Amino acid sequence: MSGTPAVTFYRWKDLALEKVTDSLDRRLITAERMMLAQVYLKKGCIVPKHQHENEQLTYILEGALRFWIGDDGKQEIVVKAGEVLHIPSNIAHRAQALDDTLDVDVFSPPRWDWLNHTDTYFHRKEK
């Protein structure tokens, strides 16, 4: 049937592992209106404060992440294996891996800064 979008099948193990920093690697699957990311964070890894238009779901498969939410970072949430955090569009957040952590992030729309490698906030040093 012409006009019917084709389905696509993926295996994580077949996708390239991108080294973002010394303590963070990821694999990406991108569709027209969403993105799925498998993210590996070493214990102690810091994701500096940032915000984006993309709505985000973070599902922790292994380990745990501590999030600081909002411009002031006063809301603190620890997300452990089996738990999911929803971050609405344009909400500032930062995170720290409390253990070696594997998470799956869903973004809508896709994170074009991740795809075109303009996500420079990963390399900012935080105090």
Name these PLM-found stretches:
Residues 1-33, 37, 120-127:
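A short, N-terminal "cap"/entry segment at the start of jelly-roll beta-barrel domains
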Residues 20-22, 37-51:
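Conserved short histidine dyad/triad with adjacent acidic residue
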Residues 40-42, 52-67:
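Short, conserved beta-strand element in jelly-roll/cupin
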Residues 46-48, 66, 84-94:
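Histidine-centered metal-chelating micro-motifs
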Residues 61-62, 80-81, 99:
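A cytosolic small-molecule/anion-sensing beta-strand core signal
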Residues 73-89:
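Short acidic-glycine-tyrosine-enriched beta hairpin
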Residues 89-113:
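Ligand-binding loop in jelly-roll beta-barrel domains
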